[in-house]
């Protein structure tokens, strides 16, 4: 599995937060994708 995205912190810029959320979604999708 890919490494879990690191939370950028409470003082992160909106761009950093958006990138983190996108990475987190991709990470969760990889974890929950069924493996046939």
UniProtKB/Swiss-Prot annotation:
Modified residues (Tyrosine amide): 36
Cellular component annotations (GO), alphabetically ordered: extracellular space
Source domain of life: Eukaryota
BP terms from Gene Ontology: feeding behavior; neuropeptide signaling pathway
PROSITE patterns, per the entry: PANCREATIC_HORMONE_1, PANCREATIC_HORMONE_2
CDD domains: PAH
Keywords on record: Amidation, Hormone, Secreted
Matching InterPro entries: Pancreatic_hormone-like (IPR001955), Pancreatic_hormone-like_CS (IPR020392)
Major subcellular site: secreted
One Pfam match: Hormone_3
Subcellular location: Secreted
Gene Ontology MF terms in the entry: neuropeptide hormone activity; neuropeptide Y receptor binding
Gene3D superfamilies to which the protein is assigned, alphabetical: 6.10.250.900
Family recorded in the similarity comment: Belongs to the NPY family.
Task of the protein: Hormone secreted by pancreatic cells that acts as a regulator of pancreatic and gastrointestinal functions probably by signaling through the G protein-coupled receptor NPY4R2.
PANTHER family noted in UniProt: NEUROPEPTIDE Y/PANCREATIC HORMONE/PEPTIDE YY, PANCREATIC POLYPEPTIDE PROHORMONE
Name this polypeptide is given: Pancreatic polypeptide
Taxonomic source organism: Oryctolagus cuniculus (Rabbit)
Designated gene of the protein: PPY
